[in-house]
């Protein structure tokens, strides 16, 4: 790459002079998109995003070790309690609700995938602002989340041409979440186009987030920032200009290569939703890189009737990304913290082989002491493929039985992998039921079913507060 060409899109070329400001285009899209024109497939996927995000938020209230600390902080801050703290049976100011719910939604690393973690940056914001404003219909909430996710997906670097790539020192979820969150909040708060431009500008001034996993705070920070930007813009506070395209805009400050793909960024807004092309859900509550090894071991278990006690050893080979989930090996085989367990190939595929699934309870304190799992994890070995390519993210899993038989599998598209192997509606609902069972505020089975039904018919809901009262 010619470093001299970096940021050349900021120069005042002919196209630059005639191209409309991208932030204004997004603001207009968010402010004026008609909810009754949302394509059915997008509406269906957005409902799944909302259900899935609420579920992971509920589960974190008791399963995430750090959740009580965040909850205590929010309670201690006080303020006007008008927005639901999901899973607690309490309320807090809108900004604090967006923060805590955002953190919890992302804290278990069980939230959806695709163009970054888009739902945790948008759904908690939408619910908090809708409750704050009141009178927000389900169809409006649905449209707001769909618009925000689409903006986030369009801006997500890896879904554009290969020459446009975000500097990996920054979190895509958090950095882009300020913009998508502000678009969602502004839409729900009914801001006109000009004020939404200001909200995006105020959001940009807060953009941050090192690419280091930290207790779900990527989603909490951008959610809180998006609400703050929207509330200030609503009151008439101006935001900075040229926030995406300008010399000091996001593309120049946070991107490192050549011209952004403007056709992808703004083409066919409201008609083509990239969410449909770049979105998936996690079938298992583990690090995303564990999904392929899990799928492979489950496939071998089912096809050959394998049982843990019959296995002599399991070998997993892949690129450097796979090796990171196995070092140091002794600690990964016997994790002492849920995050360590989720990011462990030996422990996680041992769970999958022993039980034929991987569930939330497998990462609890009791689950990490499961002797059957630990004994098998001691027989799991992970190897570096000396010639790794991106395709080899599909790790090769080989099982050797005690009678000398060898079986292997290399699943490329695990369950939940966007369009290629999507989770069914029933699978997503069952995941929600499992998550909801861990809520700090107990939710009766009948209420869990009511939540599923309300979200499934969200476009018919007169006021979103009918949903939030159940959370």
Go through each PLM region and give its residues.
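Well-ordered alpha-helical segments within folded domains of soluble proteins
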Residues: 119-128, 177-182, 223-228, 290-292, ...
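Terminal-appendage/accessory-domain detector
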Residues: 1-115, 217-224, 231-471
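Glycine-rich, mobile lid/loop segments that gate access to catalytic sites or pores
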Residues: 131-228, 242-247
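Function-dense linear segments that define catalytic or interfacial modules
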Residues: 91, 96-155
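Generic structural signal for well-ordered, non-membrane alpha-helices
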Residues: 24, 28, 52, 124, ...
